[in-house]
């Protein structure tokens, strides 16, 4: 599977795993919890930065403080979803300024799953939260390196190779082409008018 970063290569593999493989056990899903939280913080931080760049104002004054609180979070260290952050993110998401910023998302880099997660923060913030299959499918984690996934379809073994799509990862692609019978190049239809992050 080839394509630029965020073109859907890993999502395609996840779909294949759900449809034709073993799917995701409860333990597998639990492993995505932290990543869902991180995706929420990453999305909100991207919008907070874009608010400044696009010169959009918050309608509600308290959201300046909420933005500062969320902006200072080190996303890599996020493992839980504390109430003060949940409240800040919900309040920010409800601000007309952030909604205008979201509507202009093609002008900056924002994950496709941002609205999906931000509109469902209450469910995700509950104690004992276990990601659904849809939550798992929408998690954005940049692929680094080369990962092979075998699938058995009607007694035929398919080996799909997922490679990182970021520019720095593309030089590794050539090593994948020995004994290859098919190549799928994926393109995200939702990004035809977006600015490429690189």
UniProtKB/Swiss-Prot annotation:
SMART domains in alphabetical order: G_alpha
Boundaries of every G-alpha domain copy: 1-198
PROSITE patterns tied to this protein: G_ALPHA (PS51882)
Membrane topology: Lipid-anchor
Subcellular location(s) of the protein: Cell membrane; Cytoplasm
InterPro entries attached to this UniProt entry: Gprotein_alpha_su, GproteinA_insert, P-loop_NTPase
GO BP of this protein: action potential; adenylate cyclase-modulating G protein-coupled receptor signaling pathway; phospholipase C-activating dopamine receptor signaling pathway
Record keyword Transmembrane helix present: no
Region listing for G2 motif, in residue ranges: 135-143
Alphabetized GO MF terms: G protein-coupled receptor binding; G-protein beta/gamma-subunit complex binding; GTP binding; GTPase activity; metal ion binding
Protein keywords: Cell membrane, Cytoplasm, GTP-binding, Hydrolase, Lipoprotein, Magnesium, Membrane, Metal-binding, Nucleotide-binding, Palmitate, Transducer
Region of interest called G3 motif, as start-end residue ranges on this chain: 158-167
Binding-site residues for GTP, renumbered to this chain: 3-10, 137-140
One cellular-component annotation, GO: heterotrimeric G-protein complex
Residues that bind Mg(2+): 10, 143
Pfam families: G-alpha
Top-level division of the source organism's lineage: Eukaryota
Biological role: Guanine nucleotide-binding proteins (G proteins) function as transducers downstream of G protein-coupled receptors (GPCRs) in numerous signaling cascades. The alpha chain contains the guanine nucleotide binding site and alternates between an active, GTP-bound state and an inactive, GDP-bound state. Signaling by an activated GPCR promotes GDP release and GTP binding. The alpha subunit has a low GTPase activity that converts bound GTP to GDP, thereby terminating the signal. Both GDP release and GTP hydrolysis are modulated by numerous regulatory proteins.
Oligomer and partners: G proteins are composed of 3 units; alpha, beta and gamma. The alpha chain contains the guanine nucleotide binding site. Interacts with RGS22. Interacts with NTSR1.
Family of this protein: Belongs to the G-alpha family. G(q) subfamily.
Protein name as it appears in the record: Guanine nucleotide-binding protein subunit alpha-11
Organism: Canis lupus familiaris (Dog)
Gene behind this protein: GNA11
